[in-house]
A protein has these predicted regions:
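Solvent-exposed, acidic/flexible segments
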Residues: 12-16, 50-59, 73, 110-118, ...
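Short, well-structured active-site flanking segments
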Residues: 67-91, 146, 196-199
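Structured C-terminal helix/loop/strand segments within mature extracytoplasmic catalytic/sensor domains
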Residues: 11-22, 42, 139-141, 184-214, ...
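Conserved catalytic neighborhood of penicillin-recognizing serine enzymes
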Residues: 87-134
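Short, conserved catalytic-motif segment at the N-terminal edge
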Residues: 21-51, 74
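Bacterial Sec-dependent signal peptides at the C-terminal "C-region" and cleavage site
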Residues: 2-13
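Active-site SXXK
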Residues: 40, 52-80, 124, 251
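Mid-domain, small-residue-enriched loop/turn segments at the edges of structured enzyme/sensor domains
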Residues: 29, 113-117, 121, 127-186, ...
Length: 281
């Protein structure tokens, strides 16, 4: 289903046609959610279909960290022991993360030491550290993260567990999201309504320091400022972005069923390019 409301109505059918053509020729399942930061324009394609969240679930973890800091429950400069030991949500059994399956080396280099909550969040967002994410999830509490997701109205997003809980994965107990749910969270950050304007500005700055830029940013003109969070596992490739163009907007693209991540990245970049072109009119 595609919905396009308010603003730029004349471009809606053309944009729908172009995006749908890209999706139809991709061989994968794709969900798209677009909303201008001023709230006047919205485009939804299968935006309520559930996908594996992969590392995009780290966005609500970040929001909950800053919420607890605002509430005085913790301070961002608090130190947390770096210990590679986590507990499955299935039976409480202990498991460890494999550095070879992670995209970060900094947190592993600090094993047995401590790192600040702020630095762990930086690693979790900018290089998608699974180790940092699991440490933060255990510190913050998954129930608190879920409550914040619900409070912010991100229906369709569910955070159940940390990364590499294989017992949970084998039972289908996964973190999931919809394109609409992720869009809502990114929009809250963009507009200063996730936690507060100061905290949201710091979160947006972290998103702008993202290292993996081959999807939504690749479809934008060089130099365009974008804050985003990617997520990928086998046959899953997601990107959720705040694009700071002349008419700022939030764009989320979720892709399922494409084996080659270079192909899925190119698809997301193509959708991003079409959205930018429509927004520029």
């Amino acid at each position: 289903m595609l919905v396009f409301v308010a603003g730029a109505q004349s471009s809606a059918p053309d944009l729908k046609t172009r995006i749908q053509k890209l999706i139809d020729s991709s061989g994968g399942e794709v969900a798209v959610a677009l909303r201008s930061v001023d709230g006047r324009t919205e485009l939804l394609i299968d935006a309520d279909k559930s996908f594996h969240a992969a590392s995009t679930m780290k966005v609500p973890v970040m929001i909950e960290l800053f919420r607890q800091a605002e509430a005085g429950t913790l301070k961002l400069d608090d130190q947390l022991p770096v210990k590679n030991e986590f507990h499955s949500i299935v039976d409480g059994s202990v498991y460890q993360l494999d550095p070879g399956d992670d995209s970060d080396s900094v947190v592993y280099a600090n094993a047995g030491k401590t790192m600040s909550l702020r630095d762990l969040c930086e690693q979790m967002i900018t290089v998608s550290s699974n180790f940092a994410a699991n440490l933060l999830i255990e510190r913050l509490g998954v129930e608190n993260i879920r409550h914040t997701v619900t409070r912010l109205g991100a229906d369709g997003m569910q955070v159940l567990r940390g990364v590499e809980d294989n017992k949970a994965f084998d039972r289908g107990m996964n973190n999931t999201t919809t394109a609409r749910g992720l869009m809502v969270l990114m929009e809250k950050i963009a507009t200063g309504h996730a936690v507060n304007p100061s905290a949201d500005a710091e979160m947006a700055a972290m998103l702008k320091r993202q290292h993996f830029n081959d999807a939504i940013p690749a479809g934008l003109p060089p130099g365009t400022v974008v804050g985003h969070k990617t997520g990928s596992i086998t046959k899953i490739h997601n990107d959720a972005a705040i694009v700071y163009g002349p008419k700022p907007y939030v764009l989320v693209v979720l892709v399922r069923g494409i084996q080659d991540q270079k192909v899925s990245a190119a698809l997301i970049a193509s959708i991003s390019r079409e959205v930018w072109a429509a927004a520029a009119k």
